[in-house]
Amino acid sequence: MKFLPAFFLSVLTAFAAEGPKQSIEKLDPALDALLASDAQIETISNGSYTWSEGPAWYKGRVVFSDVPNNVAYQWIEGDAVASVFLKPSGTDEASPNQGSNGLAVDGEGRLLLCQHGSRRVARLGGDGKFVPLATKNHEGVRFNSPNDLCVAKDGAIYFTDPTYGLPKSEKSETPYHGVYKLATDGKVTLVTKEIQWPNGIALSLDQKSLYLAVSDGKNPRVATCALDGSGLRDVFLAAALKSKERAGGCDGLRLDAKGNIWTTGPGGVLILSPEGKHLGSILCGQATANLTWGDDGHTLYITSKDRLLRVKTKVKGAGF
């Protein structure tokens, strides 16, 4: 593909033969250290999934959820399309509209799942069955619908619990949307209940705070929550980016090895400095839910509605 000189374009556009218009948008020179100016946005799988979510790099493959269809898929290098990995993924028995959402891998290489249908955090056992890890909160009542999660270096699991995936036939038992910690001994503690619609979650590089993607329709944003209890702080406000051409809100997020924040937002993936400066975007052409790094740490996988995308990055993802 031949690109026009940089002074003619601030947006480098890659046209797919079919599907959404995709591009890399550079807003700050600092983006050059993170993403090549000619980085390609590849559609590596375009399947029958309705809302792809929660990708994780697991045993040499990327796995991700199709939330409404209660299925998790896997994609391995060389596959023409992702194949079914878990069905059901969000319940012990098959049921519609209650699939898994966020996926993660613990320090022992085991797959963890936020399960909407079962309203819990679980682990995939070696026998292919789900092992419940957290089914009730610190007050002894059921969670709303655990949404996304991350794993600390000490093995603790942090997760968000809005009501997005709460089965319609069931009622919330908590009057708030919590962010929780699940310790290795099984104890659940509330980190904060002060955020409405907490969604994506990641630990800071020093493990002292959480970054949270807040899916508030009127005020989508990225916030931090100090784990010492010193409070919350907004890092980036995304409402001004919303438009007909830029669908989606703040949903999933990850940090790279330098502490930059890669969060889904209006238009696709927003790339922010640790201080919250918007450096650029990966524009996916449609609403985009989540992302993760895989392979050697320089490959970013993005779940974008009915598509799984891939972009090579200069910087590695945190943890690689």
Predicted feature residues:
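Bacterial N-terminal signal peptides
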Residues: K2-A14
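Sequence-structural signature of mature extracellular/luminal beta-sheet repeat domains
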Residues: A17-F320
